[in-house]
């Protein structure tokens, strides 16, 4: 009887181990900033692991948007890299991170977020339906324009600024991230 209990316990443990292992193998990851992005983690959890998004993470924290971007969503986030933030005029990031500029920072960050999950195929379909351009309404309320140049996907803001999607379709538990090489800004 004791042997049967031990065997049953071992069988249950082995089954759970195999189940967990096969889940980890089925989870398709994408490398961003030297770290694996796991579809079972949310936008903030994954962004915090990317060495290419430390400025974005600091900005999300300063803007008080961590809880929002950890929420259910789904969200489509066009995530600027550190290099994208470095392209801004000198002192811009430091100014935006000041507590007195929290509302402005929130506006810039939420301008990079679209409600719903739009992978690159969804965006390409919208571009085709829009005769070469798609208008995306951001959580901030402004508009982004998406278009293709060859096989590359771009977004542009209402001021003429643009960003190229360098890594598309980084799936998250609460949406999708598209890594971009520029910071887009809402209408001035």
Can you annotate each of these PLM segments?
Residues 1-27:
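Bacterial Sec-dependent N-terminal signal peptides
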Residues 4, 23-188:
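Mature, structured domains of secreted/extracytosolic soluble proteins
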């Amino acid at each position: 009887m004791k042997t049967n209990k031990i065997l049953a316990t071992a069988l249950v443990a082995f089954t759970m181990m195999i189940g967990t292992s096969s889940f980890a193998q089925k989870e398709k990851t994408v490398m961003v900033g030297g770290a694996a992005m796991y579809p079972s983690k949310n936008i903030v959890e994954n962004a915090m692991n990317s060495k290419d998004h430390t400025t974005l993470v600091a900005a999300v924290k300063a803007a008080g948007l961590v809880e929002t971007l950890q929420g259910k969503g789904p969200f489509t986030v066009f995530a600027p890299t550190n290099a994208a933030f470095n392209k801004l005029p000198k002192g811009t990031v430091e100014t935006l991170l000041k507590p007195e500029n929290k509302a402005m920072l929130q506006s810039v960050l939420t301008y990079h977020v679209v409600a719903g999950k739009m992978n690159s195929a969804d965006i390409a379909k919208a571009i085709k339906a829009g005769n070469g351009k798609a208008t995306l309404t951001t959580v901030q309320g402004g508009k982004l324009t998406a278009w293709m140049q060859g096989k590359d996907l771009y977004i542009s803001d209402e001021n003429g600024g643009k960003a190229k999607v360098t890594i598309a379709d980084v799936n998250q538990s609460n949406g999708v991230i598209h890594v971009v090489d520029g910071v887009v800004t809402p209408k001035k």
